[in-house]
UniProtKB/Swiss-Prot annotation:
Pfam families: RraA-like. GO terms for biological process: negative regulation of RNA catabolic process. Keywords: Cytoplasm. It comes from Shigella flexneri serotype 5b (strain 8401). InterPro entries: RraA, RraA/RraA-like, RraA/RraA-like_sf, RraA_gpbac. The keyword Hydrolase does not apply. One of its GO terms (cellular component) is cytosol. Globally modulates RNA abundance by binding to RNase E (Rne) and regulating its endonucleolytic activity. Can modulate Rne action in a substrate-dependent manner by altering the composition of the degradosome. Modulates RNA-binding and helicase activities of the degradosome. This is Regulator of ribonuclease activity A. The gene is rraA. It comes from the Bacteria. Belongs to the RraA family. Homotrimer. Binds to both RNA-binding sites in the C-terminal region of Rne and to RhlB. GO terms for molecular function: endoribonuclease inhibitor activity; enzyme binding.
Amino acid sequence: MKYDTSELCDIYQEDVNVVEPLFSNFGGRASFGGQIITVKCFEDNGLLYDLLEQNGRGRVLVVDGGGSVRRALVDAELARLAVQNEWEGLVIYGAVRQVDDLEELDIGIQAMAAIPVGAAGESIGESDVRVNFGGVTFFSGDHLYADNTGIILSEDPLDIE
């Protein structure tokens, strides 16, 4: 499904929170949306592998990487796993790498920057916790919509028909 965050903001301005414009699209899907699962991890993506092995249909993984752009939390291998398990998208408050490969994949990936250095894989972090970045607090179960214009968040799903 295609989402237009500008239109959604016009229709639902009282019901959505707008994430500060810190992110760029690195995935092959221009827009995406779904119910979110939150993760908090710093320069370590081991926990992401565990979560992205789950069925992701209708879901978006929101990763609070502390805003670090020293190590990439998502690479092509991890993004392919997300595509294989039908995740709608990834929002990374941190960095990604292998961007040429990422843009070929049918998944939305919003992140702050790209860097060639990979993350550690020790599974240090927490999932299903409240995370805050971009002026917005994210809770697992909230609904996120993203496109090349921005990212918005709603407690409840928006009627997009």
